[in-house]
């Protein structure tokens, strides 16, 4: 069961490395491009295939991480969470839908910008999820390894989407805006139940958002390749 009472470091590094290695072996190989310039050398078709695979990987990993978390906490008396405990996600202002404003832009531009904003909004909370999990006594390695993997893939996915945006809207990059997560105090609270409730909310929101991204990328692919309402 998860506990934040004492840090437990014995053998953690080796187990994390092993877990990450096994996790990567079970995921379809996806090329990791380091910069926007390198993405510029890819065709729009290859980029769309690339982000489709990445987003599907992220969606699967978040679902697995959420499942492992729920299985772990259910054995702790009095620590069972339901959807009624779920607070508003910090990304709730991003609907990832084509509004009237978005409809006036070139096909897919508004959608790509919304997805970049949503993914960027998760970088800060994911960093702290990983940090706090690392201090948890008996925190399942499966959760930590997946959280790290998700963080890495989201960074790559953001860059790939920026590459797509540069192709469908050429010109200097615009300033990006994204919702800010402000629940760090709850995640670091001395109240153990509050810490777990905060994790529960984060995992629930991450699952929802990763599914939105996955479905939106399929929509994007349809719009850019076939230029029609999908």
Swiss-Prot record:
Tissue: Expressed in both placenta and decidual tissues. Detected first in deciduals cells early in gestation and in trophoblasts later in pregnancy.
GO molecular function terms attached to this record: hormone activity
InterPro entries: 4_helix_cytokine-like_core, Somatotropin/Prolactin
Glycosylation sites: 57
Keyword Glycoprotein annotated: yes
Pfam families, sorted: Hormone_1
Secreted recorded as keyword: yes
Entry protein name: Prolactin-6A1
